[in-house]
Amino acid sequence: MSPGLAELALAIAEAVPDLKILLTSGEAFGPFASMEAAVAAEPAEAPGDETEGAYMFYSSGTTGQPKGILRPLTGQPFNTPLRIEAMMAARFQFDDTSIYYSPAPLYHAAPLAWSIGTQMLGGTVIVTDGFDAEATLAHIERYRVTNAQFVPTHFVRMLQLPKAVRAKYDLSSLRLVVHAAAPCSIDVKEMMLDWLGPVIYEYYGFSEGGGFTIVGPEEWVARKGTVGRSITGPIHVVDDAGKELPRGEVGHVMFETQERFEYHKDPGKTAEFFGPRGWSRPGDRGWMDEHGYLFLADRSSSMIISGGVNIYPQEAEAVLTLHPAIRDVAVIGVPDKEFGEAVKAVVELMPGTVADDTLAGELIDYRFVPAEVPVYWNKP
């Protein structure tokens, strides 16, 4: 724990008394011992029976509290590359020359895993203490970043910069920009490709593992909106009863997998995740085309049913995100006596923007088809 987070560290130590090893990267304080001193006290020789461990990440908690993901140990020799490192090297061209930029919080599984993986492969990691759009461009230029990982919100914030600001920075060192974790609208992806060129890759996966798709820039341009094809095993799209659906129909996305894990101290959730067939069910809805490319509709838990019509919030969010008055947006379903559910958009406006009925009307009219028009508005 960094000394700069001393107050938070002490609160965590008090709240979780079962923590046995408490280390700080600076001078010792409270119950936290110096990491340097602890390392210096260890034998210089490696233990004779040391084997490789496994990451234990936590789920994102979209349907409740984050859950620990406990993987079986392989017993392989220490420093044997784990699957994430092998995949980064084979699929995303990471090696000992990579300079990886990670602006997202390390309590998320992907930024932490990819940062560790880069170092295991001999590369360099640049971690920031927050995201700022222009600072990101300055960092890429300063550190000659080769690989970076973003979420679509980062893309939007960078695209909102004036073109003159974006043009100030030399981004030519970028070999690969990867994004995941949330839906990226077609318009945003097209603008990023126009700006940075064919270096943008997308993947779809989940903290639990058991399913992973990848799509490169050329593939995506040919099938706009896809998150790619599986590299781990067959994908199935099924209805609520578990029946396989034809290509092109929206249903629950499931992956055939031999990979196993346990939710920490939660066998019931573990059984629910794999279901009776033993397939991974990440909780997303989507469809596949005739070539096996997966397209996502939304989280199953996010779908809004209004007057018998299925409405996917991410479609409305993708449109509203591009409006120049909006900084961020979330679209949700709210109870409605007539339709069962109505659509509600909660928007964060750009600084200096006036929230009034004129703007609300403008946003409702902004590139929507009737079934997607949000009917309630909250304006902070």
Model features per residue range: what roles?
Residues 23-29, 201-208, 227-228, 332-335:
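Beta-strand->loop->alpha-helix junctions that form or flank phosphate-binding loops
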Residues 1-3, 138-140, 148, 241-244, ...:
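AMP-binding/adenylate-forming catalytic core of the ANL superfamily
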Residues 42-52, 56-101, 123, 168:
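Conserved adenylate-forming
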Residues 10-57, 76-85, 161-164:
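ANL superfamily adenylate-forming
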Residues 36-37, 55-57, 61, 120-121, ...:
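Gly/Ser/Thr-rich phosphate-binding loop
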Residues 77-99, 103, 107-147, 161:
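Conserved AMP-binding/adenylation subdomain of ANL enzymes
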Residues 1-7, 67-70, 124-130, 201:
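Short beta-strand->loop structural element characteristic of the AMP-binding/adenylate-forming
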Residues 67-70, 79-90, 100, 137-139, ...:
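Adenylate-forming
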